[in-house]
């Protein structure tokens, strides 16, 4: 686990592809528990440690995760997420270059709970939710393209689904049309940067994620 920012109210850590943020049916140790144990050891606390999950990343996604260290910070950060006051920027490596180097995508997404998958439509349909993101090309190699993605809405698998719908699936994302998986089982989607006004101190917090260690990320992401 890599800690990238910490104060008395919150902690921001790097999640590797394959890790889960919260406990689920898999029985794997979640990142939240790893962070709790790290805090407990660091501050030599004999009892339980409070840690609030503010948001999640899909298991195959890597990058920044914010946790609250107090109940007050958790409430405020939850409200900030709800009001769009925490700005998250993603980097995605896609297997085909998009038709336009920069664009805003608007789709209507329907979530299929049984399949754990979302489907995109170009018009409103029953149970669909309007989904908007903006992307721009920031680097390319012979075979892959690196996009910077900003979400205007927060839907289930939104980036994965909308990019796939433009015939630009994320590298390794078999569920959304990538031709093959990544060796580590993850997908090439990185929660790269978060920026927000601190819920208590009111200072501007800006944190960037390190790049995943694989060779493609190191080659295409060092810009």
Residues covered by each model-derived region:
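RNA pseudouridine synthases
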Residues: 1-223
């Amino acid at each position: 686990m890599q800690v990238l920012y910490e104060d008395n109210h919150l902690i921001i850590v790097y999640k590797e592809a394959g890790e889960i943020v919260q406990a689920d049916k898999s029985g794997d140790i979640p990142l939240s528990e790893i962070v709790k144990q790290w805090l407990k050891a660091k501050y030599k606390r004999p009892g339980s440690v409070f840690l609030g999950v503010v948001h999640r990343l899909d298991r195959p996604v890597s990058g920044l995760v914010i946790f609250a260290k107090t109940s007050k910070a958790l409430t405020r950060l939850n409200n900030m997420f709800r009001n769009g006051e925490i700005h998250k920027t993603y980097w995605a490596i896609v297997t085909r270059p998009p038709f336009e180097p920069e664009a805003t995508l608007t789709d209507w997404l329907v979530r299929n709970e049984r399949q754990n998958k979302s489907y995109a439509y170009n018009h409103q349909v029953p149970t669909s939710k309007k989904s908007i993101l903006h992307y721009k090309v920031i680097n390319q190699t012979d075979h892959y393209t690196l996009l910077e993605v900003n979400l205007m809405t927060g839907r289930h698998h939104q980036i994965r689904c909308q990019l796939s719908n433009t015939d630009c699936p994320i590298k390794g994302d078999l569920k959304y049309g990538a031709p093959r998986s990544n060796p580590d089982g993850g997908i090439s989607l990185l929660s790269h940067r978060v920026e927000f006004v601190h819920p208590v101190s009111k200072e501007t917090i800006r944190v960037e994620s390190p790049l995943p260690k694989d060779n493609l990320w190191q080659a295409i992401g060092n810009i």
